[in-house]
Design a protein with these regions (language model features):
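Gram-negative outer-membrane beta-barrel domains
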Residues: 1-254
């Protein structure tokens, strides 16, 4: 006796339901500009603003709630580590002088460097779901861990070279050729936008741009006397993959 064949469910083609928790990872690049100064003896030109560039990768966790009109509200936290750094010749700094003998100390010539170890954000998201694609904007709090260095490269004869030379600090004490701060954590703000596409089986791929701004931070340098300040603005471009812990589409049709 013949039996009736059972039809297999059709492939999911309905609009995505983004409601639920999700977790994933991302990779990308970060670039920006910093502003490094000695407290009390600022650099007189713009050479103290090195560009920084590097790769980063990290993880993210969030929650979305989709409403009947296709608007999506959510919150997301992420953290990414990398090697985002840069440096340049900064010019001279009055009051921080080059080592020499029987000479009038000229202002020391410096290179300045900035290095970011990791960045994290906690942000609210507002998006709109169009079929299987989510378009969204975000804004919230940004955190970074970074360090700052100023290298003295000016010789006693007043001729510059790429060899680091000892300097006299603001207290007139001869110290090493490098003024560096320990790594420090500071808080700023972030805004961004992106798009996410449902790949099926609760997986999705995303592309995102974020702008992070961190206000000026002051830290005691390694000589124990001199203070360095630093502020930075960073742009991130990230590609990522997420897994949603909830049904990804309206459902199969039989």
């Amino acid at each position: 006796m013949p039996t009736k064949a059972v039809r297999a469910p059709r492939a999911l083609t309905g609009p995505t339901n983004w409601t639920g928790f999700y977790a994933g990872g991302f990779a990308g690049a970060a670039a920006g500009r910093t502003d490094i100064q000695f407290v009390g003896t600022p650099f007189p030109d713009a050479g103290n603003k090195p560009w920084v560039l590097g790769g980063l990768g990290g993880i993210e966790l969030g929650y979305n709630r989709q409403f009947g009109n296709n608007w999506v509200l959510g919150v997301e936290g992420d953290i990414g580590a990398g090697n985002v750094h840069g440096g340049r010749t900064a010019g001279t700094a009055d009051g921080v002088n080059a080592k020499g003998e029987n000479v009038t100390f000229a202002p020391a010539l410096f290179t300045v460097e900035d290095k970011t170890n990791w960045m994290a954000t906690v942000a609210g998201r507002v998006g709109y779901s169009w079929g299987r694609t989510l378009f969204y904007g975000k804004g919230g709090v940004a955190i970074e861990d970074s360090s700052t260095t100023a290298n003295c490269i000016y010789g006693a004869t007043g001729q510059s070279s790429d060899v680091h030379r000892p300097c006299r600090n603001q207290a007139g004490i001869e110290k090493e050729d490098r003024f560096s701060t320990p790594s420090y954590t500071r808080v700023g703000w972030t805004i961004g936008f992106g798009t996410e596409f449902d790949l099926g089986k609760n997986w999705s791929a995303k592309a995102e741009y974020d702008f992070l701004s961190f206000g000026r931070h002051t830290a005691l340098a390694s000589d124990g006397t001199t203070f360095l300040t630093d502020r930075s603005d960073i742009s991130q471009v990230k590609l990522g993959v997420n897994y949603r812990f909830a049904p990804g589409a309206v459902g199969p049709k039989f």
